[in-house]
Amino acid sequence: MNFNSESAIFTSSKDFNILDFSQMNKYLIKKKIKYLIHVAGLSRPMSIHENNISKSINLNIIGTANIVKVCKKNNIKLIYISTNYVYPGVKGNYNENSPLKPFNNYAWSKLGGEASVQLYKNSLILRVCMTDFPFTHKKAITGAKTSFMFNKYVAKIIPLILDEKGILNIGGKKREIINFANKFSNKRIASIHLNKIKNYPKDTSLNINKLKKLLIEKKLNISDYIK
């Protein structure tokens, strides 16, 4: 697919409420949508998924199931943004076939969304390890590793893989979180050790060989996307 910013439609919950099947169906028909990138949902703060499980279930599981149904009805390709948190977060280097074991309610809610997407074969699940650009946090963790990629690079990759199906990990190089923060920040980031954070995973890093292979097949420079 040839994709550019002019061909994309960015909507809001007012016009496209994922809990309102009828509204979504009318919108998709009116706009003649061929691809739907599902980024709506509930993420931060993580505590909300512990304190308000009804909201977490409604937005991340039921809302996603509604999107699957409306995409199926209209034969629309669905791209679902999931998270690397569905993996156990113990040994790292998780590939798309690694066993899954979410470590918090947010991750369980995203895996619940994945379950409904898996029923629809015209779909692509992206397990993304992403953070905001620029790095917005005042502190970064020592003793924990991951595969952060800034959201601006994820946004560059997604249009290139719209026609893929199945599951794909998206992330950057494996690094200790504090090292990532200091490498890409224009100011020194304070550190906090993993042991001081309750229930934080030790290593959520991703194996991104499949992503690299796709970029190479498209004759793209990996270093333009994976930092």
Predicted regions and their residues:
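Amphipathic terminal alpha-helices
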Residues: E217-K227
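NAD(P)H-binding glycine-rich loop region in Rossmannoid oxidoreductase-like domains
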Residues: F21-L59, V70
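Conserved Rossmann-fold NAD(P)-dependent oxidoreductase catalytic core, especially the SDR/UDP-sugar
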Residues: A65-K101
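Active-site Tyr-X1-5-Lys
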Residues: K101-C129
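Substrate-positioning beta->alpha
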Residues: F135-D163
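Glycine-rich NAD(P)-binding loop of the Rossmann-fold in SDR/ketoreductase-type enzymes
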Residues: L19, Y35, N51, K55-N66, ...
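Rossmann-fold cofactor-recognition segment
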Residues: T11-S22
